[in-house]
From Swiss-Prot:
One of its GO terms (cellular component) is translation initiation complex. Residues 329-348 have a biased composition (Polar residues). This is Eukaryotic translation initiation factor 4E-binding protein Mextli homolog. Interacts with eukaryotic translation initiation factor ife-3. Residues 349-360 have a biased composition (Acidic residues). Residues 126-163, 314-360, 395-424 are annotated as: Disordered. GO terms for biological process: positive regulation of translation; regulation of formation of translation initiation ternary complex; translational initiation. Residues 140-158 have a biased composition (Low complexity). Signal peptide: none annotated. GO terms for molecular function: eukaryotic initiation factor 4E binding; RNA binding; translation initiation factor activity. Binds to ife-3 using a bipartite interface in the C-terminal domain which comprises a canonical helix which engages the ife-3 dorsal surface and a non-canonical helix which engages the ife-3 lateral surface.
C-alpha cells in the first residue's frame, strides 16, 4: 500500500494501491508521489516507504520528465530540493542504491531528459544495480505486531538472473580485497533500518559508501592511465604562451592611467591586446607596480609606450578609427567633371587629402574660445602645444616692459605739450570684495562697463609751460577749465591713450 504522510502530524493515510514501476502513471499520481517525498523528507522519516517512492518516481520521470518540465516545473523543483535535503540529512539509511537513483535522476534532468548510451551503461553496470535496487519491505500495521507479518507490497522488475539480496552491511566495509568474501552468505535481509527493526546492524554504515578503486579491472586501469598520459602533451601544446612584464609608476599617476571607471586602461588594453593589472598598495605609498600580460613582446612594448604617453599628456589614448574623416570636396562636381577616368580622380583625391591633412583652421567663438580644426590628431596636438607655449611666452612681460610699468606706477604729473591740448581720463568703477571670495568681485566686474569721462585740462599761462617751476592748479583754474569747451582730440592720440590707460589704472 502507498502511504502518504501529512505535512505536520506525520500520520499515515491510506492511498491507492501501488502499481508496478514499469506501468506509466498519470500526471496526478506522479504529483502525488512528489508530495509524498516532500512530506516524508520534511518530517525526517527516512524509511523503506521513502526509498520505494523514490525508485518509482525515477522510473516514471524517465518517460514523462520532459512533459512535466513544461507543465509542472515548480513541483519538479520542489521534489528535487527534497531529494537533495534527504541526501544531506539521513545517517546512511538511504543506502548506496537509493543515492545512485537520485544521482541518475539529477543527471537526467541536467541533460534535458535526453539519455545517452554512456549514461545508461554507467548505471546498468554498477554492481549495486545488478540486483533488485529496492527490495521493498512492508511496514507492519502496528508497532507491536510480530515480524512474521512483514510482506512485500510492490513488485520489483524481474532480474535477468537470480542475484543475492541486498545487504545493509557491505561485504568488505574496510575496502580490503578478501578472496573468501564471495563464499560468505549474509544473515539478516533488510534494506533500510527502521526505528524498531527485528535485526540490529553489525556495524554503523559509512556515510558515503562508494566502491573502492581496486575493484576496477587492471586492464581498464592501465588503459585510463595511458589515455591520461597521452592527453597531457596535447593540452600543453594547445595553450598559448603568455608573457608578463612589470613596470613601476608613481602612485600619484595611477588615476591618470586608470581614468574614470577604468576607461583609459580599458582603451589601452583594447588597442594593445594586453591585460594590465594594478598592484594593491597603501594610499601613502609612493610607487606602484603594473603587470602587463600579452602573447607577444611587441604588444607589451606598445602598451608601455601608450601608458607613458597617457600619463604624460593626462589624456585618453588616441584611437586611429576615431579621427575626423576629410571633407568630400567632390560632392558638388558637375556631370562633366564626373566623367574623368577613375585613375585621375583617385590621384587628385589623394593629393587633396594630403593637403587637407596639413591644413589647420583656427576659429574664435562668440565667447572668446579658440577652436582648432584638423584631420590629423598628431598635428592637432602639436598645434595645441605650440599655441600654449606662445601664449605663455606672450603673457610674460619682458624686462623693458617691466621697467616701463614701474615708471608708470610713479605718481608724476602729466606734462602739457600744447596750450589747448586736452586728454580724456578713463574712469573705471571701483571693485568691492565681499568676504573671502574675490571671485564674486570678478563676476560683478564682468557685468559692469567701463565709463569714459571727458575732463578738460586746465588752461595755464605760457610762463608755467616754459618755466622750470612745477605746474600747480588752484580752485579758480579748475572751475574755469570745467566750464570751458574743450577742443576735439585727434584719433591717433585717442588710440595711444586707450593703449596706455589700462596699465596706468591697474597699477
Amino acid at each position: 500500500m502507498l502511504h502518504n504522510y501529512d505535512d505536520f502530524g506525520g500520520g499515515k493515510m491510506q492511498g491507492a494501491p501501488q502499481v508496478p514501476r514499469n506501468t506509466l502513471l498519470s500526471v496526478d499520481q506522479q504529483l502525488q508521489l512528489m508530495n509524498t517525498i516532500n512530506n516524508m523528507v520534511r518530517a525526517s522519516q527516512f524509511t523503506s516507504q521513502l526509498a520505494n517512492t523514490i525508485f518509482t518516481l525515477c522510473a516514471q520521470l524517465k518517460t514523462s520528465g520532459s512533459m512535466l518540465e513544461q507543465s509542472h516545473k515548480n513541483e519538479l523543483n520542489k521534489v528535487f530540493t527534497s531529494l537533495r535535503q534527504a541526501c544531506c540529512r539521513d545517517n546512511g539509511q538511504l543506502g548506496t542504491p537509493c543515492r545512485l537513483k537520485i544521482m541518475e535522476l539529477v543527471e537526467l534532468r541536467a541533460m534535458n531528459w535526453r539519455t545517452n548510451l554512456a549514461h545508461s551503461q554507467y548505471y546498468v553496470n554498477r554492481p549495486e544495480g545488478q540486483h533488485d535496487p529496492a527490495p521493498t519491505v512492508g511496514i507492519p500495521p502496528s508497532a507491536t505486531s510480530p515480524p512474521t507479518q512483514v510482506t512485500s507490497s510492490v513488485t520489483s522488475p524481474v532480474p535477468s538472473s537470480p542475484q543475492p539480496p541486498m545487504q545493509f552491511v557491505p561485504q568488505n566495509p574496510m575496502m580490503f580485497q578478501d578472496p573468501m568474501a564471495a563464499n560468505h552468505n549474509a544473515g539478516g535481509i533488510f534494506f533500510i533500518p527502521a526505528a524498531s527493526t527485528w535485526m540490529n546492524p553489525l556495524m554503523p554504515m559509512p556515510p558515503n559508501p562508494f566502491l573502492p578503486h581496486s575493484m576496477i579491472p587492471p586492464d581498464h586501469q592501465m588503459f585510463l592511465r595511458q589515455r591520461s598520459l597521452n592527453k597531457k602533451p596535447n593540452n600543453l601544446m594547445n595553450k598559448t604562451l603568455q608573457l608578463r612584464h612589470e613596470m613601476i609608476i608613481r602612485n600619484s599617476d595611477s588615476g591618470k592611467i586608470m581614468g574614470v571607471k577604468g576607461r583609459r586602461v580599458a582603451a589601452v588594453e583594447q588597442l594593445t591586446n594586453t591585460v594590465i593589472s594594478f598592484q594593491k598598495v597603501d594610499s601613502k605609498s609612493k610607487e606602484r607596480t603594473l603587470t602587463i600580460t600579452a602573447s607577444t613582446m611587441e604588444d607589451i612594448e606598445r602598451a608601455k609606450d601608450m601608458i607613458i604617453d597617457t600619463i604624460r599628456r593626462n589624456m585618453s589614448p588616441m584611437r586611429t578609427d576615431m579621427s575626423i574623416p576629410p571633407p568630400n570636396q567632390y560632392s558638388g562636381m558637375s556631370s562633366e567633371n564626373q566623367s574623368i577616368p577613375s585613375q585621375q580622380n583617385t590621384a587628385n583625391i589623394d593629393e587633396d587629402d594630403d593637403d587637407d591633412d596639413e591644413d589647420i583652421k583656427l576659429e574664435q567663438t562668440s565667447d572668446g574660445k579658440l577652436t582648432f580644426h584638423c584631420d590629423d590628431p598628431e598635428l592637432l596636438a602639436a598645434a595645441q602645444e605650440a599655441l600654449s607655449a606662445y601664449l605663455r611666452v606672450r603673457a610674460r612681460p619682458s624686462a623693458e616692459e617691466r621697467e616701463k610699468k614701474k615708471e608708470r606706477r610713479k605718481s608724476m604729473p602729466l606734462q602739457q605739450t600744447a596750450r589747448d591740448q586736452q586728454e580724456p581720463v578713463m574712469l573705471k568703477p571701483a571693485k568691492t570684495f565681499h568676504g573671502s571670495t574675490p571671485n564674486l568681485a570678478d563676476g560683478l566686474a564682468a557685468t559692469t562697463t567701463v565709463v569714459v569721462a571727458s575732463i578738460p585740462q586746465p588752461m595755464v599761462p605760457n610762463v608755467h609751460a616754459s618755466g622750470d617751476n612745477p605746474i600747480r592748479y588752484n580752485r579758480d583754474t579748475l572751475m574755469t577749465a570745467r566750464d570751458t569747451k574743450r577742443a576735439p582730440i585727434p584719433d591717433e592720440m585717442l588710440q595711444e591713450i586707450n593703449r596706455v590707460a589700462p596699465d596706468i589704472l591697474i597699477a
